[in-house]
Amino acid sequence: MSAFVTDQFRILNANSFIESINDNSYYAFLGLSNPTTPNPGFGRTSDWNTSINNNPIDNFQYLSHYRDTSLFGKKITSENVRRVVKRVDWISNTSYDMYRHDYSEYTEAPSSKVFNLYNSNYYVITDEFKVYICLENGTSGKNPTNVPRSLFKPVDTSIEPPTVGSDGYRWKYLFTISPSDIIKFDSTEYFIVPNNWENSLNNEIVRIRDGGNSDIQNNQIKKVYIESGGSGYVDTTASILGDGSGGEVSITTTNGEITSVVVTSGGKGYTYGIVNLNSSSGTGAKLIPIIPPSKGHGYDIYKELGTDKVLIYARFDDSTKDFPTDTKFAQVGILKNPETFSGVGITFTGGNFSSLYSIGITTSISINVGDKITQNQGNGLIAEGYVASFDTETKIL
């Protein structure tokens, strides 16, 4: 039987990593200073930086030598770690997918042509760094590939999303990225999601989060998708059956075909549902209530947006001599609970570290980053090292 790692397991892994930051000592480190040809450094060949097939090496040999190749590192704190999702910018005259709970190999996202919610373009970030999820995009099963274009930038920040716009879109506000997070984490490929969403006391987060889990919003249905309009129907109202209660819709028809279904009461407590058409004389209609994530939109944005990736911010500058700026690097990594140099079993907890040895030079010689230096140890033993940095003023190698 085949198996695969689910999206929810990946999200759990990202959550677990972030939650472990405060209980452990994690460090972002740089390594593998750029050598000069023809003296490639440890673990490299002379063309390591030019090969078109330059895939990273991941084996126990390299794992054992990270201490030899690392240059310096900086401690990772919870303030410098965020969950991220792929960046989908709102652009006028662009088509977007709507949120659906049932995208799969049997149900394709009509705009992005994918079969997974988290791979589809069902949310956007605006130029004001506000994030919205798309609840409706004007599509139906009658013509699922004809996705209207979004013409009006979402701006409403109410808990209850506004009615459908004339372009067919309906957007639900989730959050706004803070200016401090923009400075640290802004990216062309991803945008960050606020930390500690489930326990935050931030007024804006509390408003959206609690709105997704109130008596009114709890698993409330916001949208019913018309997969098939059928025939022989008349304008009417109908209830939404399932494991929730209180859901009702208003149905509009054209020549006997259902052409509009408006949720007049979303009810609460639904994890599945069907529109009750048993009292109707029509046939062939298929109406799909769209089930919200978790307890409602905005309650758990990590599941709602699929935050299975983590972005780490680490700034290395010349404010400390531990971070020389005249070097280069080809390795970026994360260390967990490194031990101090002098004590076995003692975890290093400082703010930054240097893995480099230093030598004072008393003679005038030409030294370049990447040069190989040797020392005869006697008995045929020769120690080798590579220059990571050289301070021409202090003569410290």
Could you say what each language-model-derived stretch is?
Residues D167, W171-L397:
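Conserved, function-critical positions that sit in or immediately flank catalytic
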Residues M1-I216, K286-I290, N337-E339, I382-E384:
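Tryptophan-rich substrate-binding surfaces of secreted polymer-degrading and adhesive proteins
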